[in-house]
Amino acid sequence: SVLALYEDRAVLYGANGGEKASYDFGGSTLVDVDTENGGVALLLSGGQTCTAVLLDNGLNVQYSGNVPAASHILRAADGFYLLTDSTVECFNKAGEFQWTQPMDAKPQAGVLNGRQLLVFSGNTVQQVTAPEPDSSSAS
C-alpha cells in the first residue's frame, strides 16, 4: 500500500493502484503528518484551531479533536506528541492531555526512537521525558 497526501485529503492506494481508503481534511490545511507506530497522525489547521487526527493503517479514525497550536505531530504507540513554539505536549490515544515540557528554543523536529522522544531545537538534540512529579508539594 502507498499513502498519498493531497491538499485536501489522504488516500491509501493498493498494490494494483486502486484507491483502498481515504480521509478528507474537511476544509482544513495539513500542517504535519507522521506515519509511525501502526498508523497515521495528522495535524490539521482550520483558521484559529488545530486538530489532531489519529488514523489506523486503513485510514479509519481512532481519534480526532482540537489541540493547541503546534508545528509538528509525532505518533507514539500510546498516543501522540505535539511540538509547539515553546513546549512538547503529550496526549494519550484518547486525546487526553498527559504532560507538557517547556523547551529553551523552539522545537524544530522530533523523532521517536522506540519509547525515547528526541527533539531537535536550535543546534541541540534533547531527550524529552515526562516531568518528574512535584515533590515540593508533598508534606
Q: Which sequence ranges carry the predicted segments?
A:
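Short loop/turn segments that connect beta-strands within the blades of beta-propeller domains
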Residues: 6-8, 15, 36, 48, ...
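Loop/turn-rich, solvent-exposed surfaces of beta-rich toroidal or solenoidal domains
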Residues: 47, 60, 64-90
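Repeated scaffold domains used in trafficking and secretory/extracellular systems
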Residues: 1, 25-38, 66-78, 104-116
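Blade-level signature of beta-propeller repeat domains, shared across WD40, Kelch, NHL, RCC1
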Residues: 102-139
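Structural motif
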Residues: 8-13, 48-53, 87-91, 124-131
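Solenoidal tandem-repeat scaffolds enriched in leucines and small polar residues
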Residues: 1-4, 10
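Residue position within the beta-strands of beta-propeller blades
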Residues: 4, 42-43, 82, 119
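A short beta-strand motif characteristic of beta-propeller blades
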Residues: 18-24, 58-65, 96-101
